[in-house]
Amino acid sequence: MHLLTTTLISFEQNKVEYLTQIAIYTQTPVCTDSNCEHARFLKHSLIQVSIERIEYLYSIFPNIWQFALLCQGQNKESLIHMEEDASTNFKLRYYVLPWSRRLQGYQSITVQNGSHVPLVKRLEKWRIFVEC
């Protein structure tokens, strides 16, 4: 498993802004040089697909970490969803795991009208594994 990228994302759920982290891993190494156009495109595409899917999963399971604990029965990584992208034949596996790291400087975000909105840190973070 090879780390491709990691990023923090915010999303709205029930009029509350949440913060979580996603990390995308690939089966085989991918060029991480900033000049590598194909790798940049792959990262951007996978981040977009992942964000859309994660927002969808949160709409189905608002308390996804509690759901994962019930399914797994322990405080460790749980497979939540698996899908295959028809256009690329990539298989994507979505895992959640505990996110205990303290964050500083991410207490709020600025929304479109310029006001600051508080962020609530989720209990879980995401690991997406991409099989080529």
Swiss-Prot record:
Its main location: cytoplasm. Keywords: Cell cycle, Cell division, Chromosome, Chromosome partition, Cytoplasm, Cytoskeleton, Meiosis, Telomere. It comes from the Eukaryota. The gene is bqt1. GO terms for cellular component: chromosome, telomeric repeat region; cytosol; meiotic spindle pole body; nucleus; nucleus leading edge. The keyword Zinc-finger does not apply. The keyword Cytoplasm applies. Involved in chromosome segregation. During meiotic prophase, connects telomeres to the spindle pole body by forming a bridge between the telomere protein rap1 and the spindle pole body protein sad1. This is Telomere bouquet protein 1. It is found in: Cytoplasm, Cytoskeleton, Microtubule organizing center, Spindle pole body; Chromosome, Telomere. Disulfide bonds: none annotated. Interacts with bqt2 and sad1. The bqt1-bqt2-sad1 complex binds rap1. It comes from Schizosaccharomyces pombe (strain 972 / ATCC 24843) (Fission yeast). GO terms for molecular function: protein-macromolecule adaptor activity. GO terms for biological process: cell division; meiotic attachment of telomeric heterochromatin to spindle pole body; meiotic cell cycle.
